[in-house]
Amino acid sequence: MPSRLLPSSLLSTAGRIALAVAGTLAATLPGAAQEPATGAIKLELNALQKSEKGCRIAFVVENAMGRDIARAAYEIALFNKEGLVDRLLVLDFQELPNEKTKVRRFDLADADCDAIGRVLINDASACEGDGLEPGDCIARLEATSRSTVTFGK
């Protein structure tokens, strides 16, 4: 039998108090509706180093979104020194715990570090976690570079 809502005039005072307490508890339980993400993902292009495979690119990433990110991945475009797109690839930054800074390194096979003139964050291909919207990982991304290579979105 489906449950029915009763008009408040039919509830006793104790019943109304019990309903108010239950509603308050439900709103504070994990998994209840959460506030939208308000912070940022700070992504720094830290270094490009020659490696046995080609070029190793290092990023420092800080999750300041106010919640854990179960998975973040970005589509990256590499441009040569002449400004031409050399390749598109997806870099999976995996899990990013809230208020944690991590270093992520990626080996780019057959890439010449010295030939890379610009790294563009084209889009977020994955943005997963409780309370996150699909576009949060790109909209709230702050990109900086310690390298001579131009980096941004």
Task: Cite the ranges covered by each PLM segment.
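Asparagine-centered strand-capping/turn motif at beta-strand->loop junctions
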Residues: 59-66
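Intrinsically disordered, low-complexity Pro/Gly/Ser/Thr-rich segments with frequent PxxP/GP/PP motifs
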Residues: 79-117
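Terminal connector regions
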Residues: 110-153
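Bacterial N-terminal signal peptides that target proteins for export
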Residues: 2-18
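N-terminal signal peptide c-region/cleavage motif recognized by signal peptidases
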Residues: 27-31
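Low-complexity, acidic Ser/Thr/Pro/Gly-rich terminal tails and inter-domain linkers that flank the onset
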Residues: 34-54, 58, 147-151
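Short acidic/proline- and small/hydrophobic-mixed sequence motifs that coincide with surface turns
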Residues: 68-71
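Hydrophobic beta-strand segments
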Residues: 74-76
